[in-house]
Amino acid sequence: KEEVPVFLAQKIMPGTCKAVLTQPDGLKVDISNTSYLDYITNKSLPVVSMEKEELDTLPLRYYTITIPRGGEYSLTLSDGSILTMNSESEIRIPENFDKRQRDVYMSGEIYFEIARDTAVPFIVHTDRGNIKVLGTSFSVRDYQDETFLETTLVSGKIAFNQSEKEVYLKPNEQLRLNKENGETTVEMVDVRLY
């Protein structure tokens, strides 16, 4: 008789609410038990009275939210957009959105429900391209150690920009970008899987 090794499957636990906020000054704060907006609006900062024109000339300050392995986190941005972040993901968000466009910078996997504002587009920046949104629901998966960037559109309309090329997606479509050769493909998918 030949002995066959038996491998026991490791139990994979569902993600738990874990998040670390890095403030513009570099201070790291565990925000696992609070919402991002509650933290930002309730933190004790001195109130400074300034004219709107003065505020527009201030440099943008960014907060970074990092989700460790095994974590997940949902947050609502100041514009009403809702983000659901998966394990090992990161997003950089300005303290206040610019009046011309709403820019965020991400890596990992995030599901976006963007508040509609046709005058101020929402731009998701990744290492390989940008996604321009007017008001929609979609996901982006862009882990550093994976060959493909994927963005899947649930509703609305998005445009993926890479260098000089722009690709528009319709609901139920997924764009896959091969990070090694730059090729993009678009196909219909079951969005419930994403």
State where each predicted segment sits.
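A residue-level detector for the "anchor" residue at the start of short, highly conserved motifs
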Residues: 1-194
